[in-house]
Amino acid sequence: MSETVPPAPAASAAPEKPLAGKKAKKPAKAAAASKKKPAGPSVSELIVQAASSSKERGGVSLAALKKALAAAGYDVEKNNSRIKLGIKSLVSKGTLVQTKGTGASGSFKLNKKASSVETKPGASKVATKTKATGASKKLKKATGASKKSVKTPKKAKKPAATRKSSKNPKKPKTVKPKKVAKSPAKAKAVKPKAAKARVTKPKTAKPKKAAPKKK
């Protein structure tokens, strides 16, 4: 009797496990990225808002800024160093003016000139874009006109015609002086004939008839 060999088991479920592990890592990265992004405005924006809302002439103190940030829902105790860094950066940029104290400690006031520039960034960008587009259109028109002006003189160049016109005026110059030289000789020969005719014909005096005497 012949012995039957059992078939080898197929490895089907083995490659599926690492794929499942890779898929599980992607949502974890997305969750970490979502945690890193802070919700709401940044520290510098909150400081600017607090300084603009205050009505004190001498400026807002650091304690007053911290109170305003805490009221807005910002964790002041954990982010104390960030608040100080934000104040220093705003002072260096010119958005805040330090009226009292040095460094992060003291009182600060909002710079009106810097705030007006920051509130209108879109308008300045639109103005610069319109100026750039207008200048580019003018440059395109100028380049098109220059190309046309360069092409036109090529058609106007005709060296053969200019050479022919320069040769033609030489011929009449040689012919004209001969005719002028002949005409005065004829006029001089005619004048002495008229003088001879006047000399050869002297006028003779006719005798007057005597009147008859009356009886």
UniProtKB/Swiss-Prot annotation:
Q: Which residues carry this modification: N6-(beta-hydroxybutyryl)lysine?
A: 37, 55, 67, 88, 93, 109
- PTM-bearing positions, type Phosphothreonine: 204
Pfam families (alphabetical)? Linker_histone
Where is the sequence biased in composition, kind Low complexity?
122-147
The region called Disordered is annotated at: 1-43, 94-215
PROSITE patterns cross-referenced by the UniProt entry = H15
What does the record say mutating residue 152 to E does? Answer: Significant destabilization of binding to chromatin
Q: Which GO terms describe its cellular component?
A: cell surface; chromatin; euchromatin; nucleoplasm; nucleosome; nucleus; vesicle
Q: In what way is this protein post-translationally modified? A: H1 histones are progressively phosphorylated during the cell cycle, becoming maximally phosphorylated during late G2 phase and M phase, and being dephosphorylated sharply thereafter. Citrullination at Arg-57 (H1R54ci) by PADI4 takes place within the DNA-binding site of H1 and results in its displacement from chromatin and global chromatin decondensation, thereby promoting pluripotency and stem cell maintenance.
What domain of life is recorded for the organism?
Eukaryota
Q: Where is the composition biased (Basic residues)?
A: 20-38, 148-181, 188-215
GO biological process: one example = positive regulation of receptor-mediated endocytosis
By its UniProt entry, which CDD domains does this protein fall under? H15
Residue positions of the PTM N6-acetyllysine?
17, 78, 93, 125
Q: What is its main location?
A: nucleus
Per UniProt, the keywords (alphabetical) are: Acetylation, Chromosome, Citrullination, DNA-binding, Hydroxylation, Nucleus, Phosphoprotein
SMART domains linked to this entry: H15
A GO MF label: heparin binding
What assembly does the database describe for this protein? Interacts with DFFB.
> Its biological function?
Histone H1 protein binds to linker DNA between nucleosomes forming the macromolecular structure known as the chromatin fiber. Histones H1 are necessary for the condensation of nucleosome chains into higher-order structured fibers. Also acts as a regulator of individual gene transcription through chromatin remodeling, nucleosome spacing and DNA methylation.
- Could you give the domain comment from the record? The C-terminal domain is required for high-affinity binding to chromatin.
Q: Which family does it belong to?
A: Belongs to the histone H1/H5 family.
Name assigned to this protein:
Histone H1.1
What organism, scientifically named, is this protein from?
A: Homo sapiens (Human)
Q: Which gene encodes it?
A: H1-1
